[in-house]
């Protein structure tokens, strides 16, 4: 699916876009003051986004579509599930517009397309995160009618803490404390 006007094309990413996607991810990490945090590779993106069971979806915005297009931004998203609504949800992992294309409606067009996908897929909610200090983004999202869930805390577990908790599963299993069914991923 693509949506275009004379100045902008929004299209679904293709396998040949993994280098561009990774460039956008790295540029976003720099903007978010985490330039060394990206460990993803092109091979990771190719495997996880374009295989038989993709874990993510990605939209690419190209400016000056009539001229072959220049990469302007991207939206990177995946589906989750809300036990409270009993329906799928859409989670926007990344939204990024190159600095030279900001203020031209690229971000709004990408976010509108993601919202349209959520509605098409019968998702009652679209959710994402924004850094507190990113006031241009906070103001932008507020202007579109987004609500901010200040009472919720974002929780993450990585590295040694994740491995330690995973090891607890094996320890409980070997102790006979918990029986488990093998689940295919």
PLM regions with names:
Residues 9-21:
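A short beta-loop-alpha structural element at the N-terminal edge
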Residues 22-48:
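Conserved GNAT-fold acetyl-CoA-binding loop/helix
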Residues 47-60, 91:
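A short helix-loop-beta-strand connector motif used in the catalytic cores of GNAT acetyltransferases and
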Residues 60, 69-78:
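Conserved beta-strand in the GNAT
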Residues 61, 103-108:
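Glycine-rich acyl-CoA binding loop
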Residues 108, 112, 120, 132-151, ...:
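Conserved active-site alpha-helix within GNAT-family acetyltransferase domains
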Residues 119-129:
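Conserved GNAT acetyl-CoA-binding A-motif
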Residues 128-137, 156-160:
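Conserved beta-strand-loop-alpha-helix junction that forms the acyl-donor binding cleft
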